[in-house]
């Protein structure tokens, strides 16, 4: 059969002699080999044609004598052991990526400088008969090229040893014993050099390479990138292989039979090179003639479809006893049984007829030769498992709508790269792990790295975050007068999604990432050569944009108005908390990319359409080391979530924190916390000591017992803020940006709310203590004396706020008791009874909260906590009524000019302090909100916050301090399903089962789209049922707590009745007073209201509250005034 194929191929080749253009096209395919005379004539013809261009000079690799000898033997068909190398082995790179690739001729003795750009032609003795020689672009030396892999410890070859990256040197000799150069990037060998060559091409001959040419649309993609118009290749083979602007990279797929790297997208080229007999056998059409392959070729969408991953003939399995050499590029099986992708939640669904080939009759007659997966041969890249997998045809068809020529799509759009990371984050460069941005011919500089951390959030929450990011990228792409942003802005932004634990990730989140092209399953492994995989990394540049998010749907779209997004999806094997995710981001990928700004977001946080850009603008000030925007509460469609009082109260709390706290702290230059849900840091500011202190919380658990530090690192973002500002010999400051905002989901149920605040309160308290104890480090920083004084004042201000918070439990009770007793003394009636009833309710709720906090989980006692919050809300209503009632009565007495005058009322300590307290809180809220120009929360959320404020003080604080020993984040590890292991052979290769056909890859893509289709928001909204053991444990704990509460209360009643305590004595005394008596009569009856010490304490606390309110009001006013003048000045 093989001889028959060869004869047919020779006959077909002889018939095509008179078609030089066709012959040239297939000169490097590995299937046709012209005679020496033909190749010499063709070479001379193209040399003359390009001579007029004047800009192309031959590039030669510098080799030592023994290397040249080995190369000569290789190109002449000898492997150095007197073994003849066949054509397929010699043309390993044929048909790979852009297949017009030229084998470089060896250097001569006269080429002793690789950077020499002379334009002389090569001597004839160095032009081999079997390899045509073409002029290549000249070489220019760039002296200030940034490092590709920073702080890498691996030894790099010098320019003399390895003048430029030679892909042929690696792929042509991967079966030889000598060492092959690294393929880390196009200029890998120059990572530590001051100069390295790059390909240069004159402006008038700049070709389009593999950059997609976009249609005319508002984003200005039709500018040809940097204003250069696309030109033809002028038959330059180097231009056909590598994009001259550097926007393509070398893929790493799998090995073929002869050890060559296989290009999955080379189906049409390989089919065109077959003889009619081979095509007829390959296509397996029994019902009609092939017609010289014309119908078959027309049925293939060039550039859209990829051939199957590793096309093997059935005979190969019986002929060989191992799978190492089971590949042939002479026979390609084309399958088209994919299920059309359609989705009600996606606009990227393909039609029934929109399959890999357009001829339905042809595809119906093709028989499947094998199943969807087969074992293929791979080779570790620098000891790491790296695999570029083709994406589904649905995505390719959608991407094709964004460009006039689908063949111009670079590899970053056609492939998804997978890496199995087997090291710690700070060892990525050392262990030869890299990212695609560093592998382009011209490595991309990253200005902005967006880090999205997620745990088990669903596709709706993840989609909200990604939609906000995509909207911001669109905004920056539209910028016309920016020196940083513009049509190429997307190339400077990398979106890094880090999921905490493979066993915890939500299946629909994986489905969403798969629909974007950034996730495929089937080849991930959890062990490589007995090294555990710590993270699975998926890289892809998607053109699919999220256009709309509803409660149940994520709408996707791909057209000429969408922008590419560079996605880096990192799936951690184990659940190791959020701080570990940030460690991967900062110490791992940020060290590789070296971004200027790193923005942190939580999955579920949706930034505004230009919020990321506005946040980035804050860093125009070179002293700004970190910044944050406004965190808003997601209020739902038409603000429906405001009907939930818990959500409304949090909305008011977030608003007032931004209006009063963030603005004031921004004026000082130190913000106590840049929320991890939406904040940004200058990478230069956090490197070194700040990050070391930030990540200490991850490793200290293995060093012993650290109660204080463990609680402190529950709010690790506060530690990072403090370390940035106090960094030795540096003058970094933190700023708040009012123009930037992001909405986030907040707890809607009481148990989740309590658990969240437990971590916040404990972490913030211990972090504040840490900053107070080390505030002296401000004076060792690089700030000027004025800034140091301001920061010192701010630390004293923060200390007083912490002091007030510490005594908030007793302070609130004192205010409550004074109000209820005062109105009972003054006006008797039912107030006497209510003062005792509410006192007992207050005590019972407080005692019960203590008992339940010590032994029960909020989820198992949700009803009790809800009841407690309701009781405290009723008591707050009564307190407000008492305040208003006493104020009204007092003014009535003043108007009547009766026994109590206005001066006497003001001099009454209790009444005066209450007025000051109310004025420094509620009146302050209203005035500052008006100044901030956002007063609407006062109308929609103020009442809910006031009613729940007693629960903030009592329930949340009590539960937090009763569980100060609980250092968890509400997460725990779980075992994920095993993925399998990889163990390489002596030659560094291994065998693995993968999806082999484009239809199977399409089916995998459709599977995840179906997961999105089957989403039922009602079923997701229902809380998950606890297990039987959890129910049993919770039941026993509840019974125990109720018994303790009942026992304590009943015993206290006996003591209170016998000793007349607990308000009973006060009630009896007030009852004996006539209703006509005034407050002065009540004082003569010697009913103690407050002791002198209690009065002093009460006055101090209230005046501190008033002073804190005044400082925040002044800070808010100054911030808005400065912001106004900045807008006027820079407009």
From Swiss-Prot:
BP GO terms, sorted: cell wall organization; chitin biosynthetic process; septum digestion after cytokinesis
Regulation: Requires proteolytic activation.
InterPro entries membership: Chitin_synth, Chitin_synth_fun, Chitin_synth_N, Nucleotide-diphossugar_trans
Bias type Basic and acidic residues, positions: 1-20
Catalysed reactions, as listed in the record: [(1->4)-N-acetyl-beta-D-glucosaminyl](n) + UDP-N-acetyl-alpha-D-glucosamine = [(1->4)-N-acetyl-beta-D-glucosaminyl](n+1) + UDP + H(+)
A GO cellular-component term linked to this record: chitosome
Protein name: Chitin synthase 1
Annotated organism of origin: Saccharomyces cerevisiae (strain ATCC 204508 / S288c) (Baker's yeast)
